[in-house]
Amino acid sequence: MTQTSYVLNYWNIPGRGESIRVILALGGIKFENNFVPLPLPLENPENQSPPPFDDGTWGKLKPHTPWGTLPTILLPSGETIGQQRAILRYLGKLIKHEGNYLYPEDPETSARVDGF
């Protein structure tokens, strides 16, 4: 089944997801933010071992990510891309700004872009 927009999965903080959100907005690409609760320790008044963590969202999502990390982006095709830089490169090859793709084809120029 094909979806109609992109789905960005990232923690409920700006972090590495923010640059992806900016590029999607710059390109006018519709996307859904799927904010994943941070898996931080919760209060542990009963000294449970191991201490309780988040609501379980990340534990359920993690096995379905390409590298067991966030951010990921679910493409309209149903394919999932993981890792911030891979996502940014993908989007940079899709999105034009002032007539030019955001990610250059020239190896030297693209290396400079990767250096940022």
PLM segments and residue spans:
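GST-like domain detector, emphasizing the conserved glutathione-binding G-site
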Residues: T2-F116
